[in-house]
């Protein structure tokens, strides 16, 4: 296995790690319901993307309610 020939100095180590940083996700506001959502993603509250309804949230809510009734 390959090994480094010399130890990395503190300054070189810092320069190496300078580009290793986390970026915050791009959060925007949904134009339909004004809830926060990730950009380029459908809204998880109202199910719209780019002005169109792509997820039927009423059907999902009904399915969830039926499932919870069956467990009780």
From Swiss-Prot:
One of its GO terms (biological process) is translation. It comes from the Bacteria. The keyword Ribonucleoprotein applies. One of its GO terms (cellular component) is large ribosomal subunit. Keywords: Ribonucleoprotein, Ribosomal protein. Pfam families: Ribosomal_L32p. InterPro entries: Ribosomal_bL32, Ribosomal_bL32_bact, Ribosomal_zn-bd. The keyword Ribosomal protein applies. Disulfide bonds: none annotated. GO terms for molecular function: structural constituent of ribosome. Belongs to the bacterial ribosomal protein bL32 family. This is Large ribosomal subunit protein bL32. It comes from Dehalococcoides mccartyi (strain ATCC BAA-2100 / JCM 16839 / KCTC 5957 / BAV1).
């Amino acid at each position: 296995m390959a090994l480094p020939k010399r130890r990395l100095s503190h300054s070189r180590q810092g320069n190496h790690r300078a580009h290793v940083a986390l970026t915050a996700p791009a959060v925007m506001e949904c134009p339909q319901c004004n809830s926060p959502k990730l950009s380029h993603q459908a809204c998880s509250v109202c199910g719209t993307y780019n002005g169109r309804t792509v997820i039927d949230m009423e059907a999902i809510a009904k399915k969830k309610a039926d499932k919870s009734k069956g467990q009780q």
